[in-house]
Amino acid sequence: MKILVCISCVPDTTSKVSFTDENKFNKDNIQFIIGPYEDYALARAVELKEKKSEIDISLLNVGLSENDPLLRKGLAIGADRAYRINSEPIDSNFVAHNISHFIEKNNFDLILMGKESIDYNSGLVHYLSGALLDM
């Protein structure tokens, strides 16, 4: 069985957030984490793998190379492989299109996503991805 877990990289909620003079989010001194809902999805996938060793877990992130440490963390937690679509995640629609194209090119038996990311709290990516894949 092949499981795909889609993860987002979000600021740790304990980080002090600030903005630049141009009103842009200042990433300096911000710790980024795997979103807690995506972390939960990964934990459930690993639990399934512990019960059935033939399960293969893949991680997917739409983002830039700065997210690579979190993909490596996901591998350390128990994922077998990690993929990153190298693109700035502009909005939920853009991310959903990228995820759905990746899923169409690969054959997964189960797709797990968090209910929402804690940075924008939109909760749209999984719905949009499902609609694009006619699920």
Predicted regions and their residues:
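N-terminal glycine-rich FAD/FM-binding segment characteristic of electron-transfer flavoproteins
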Residues: M1-M135
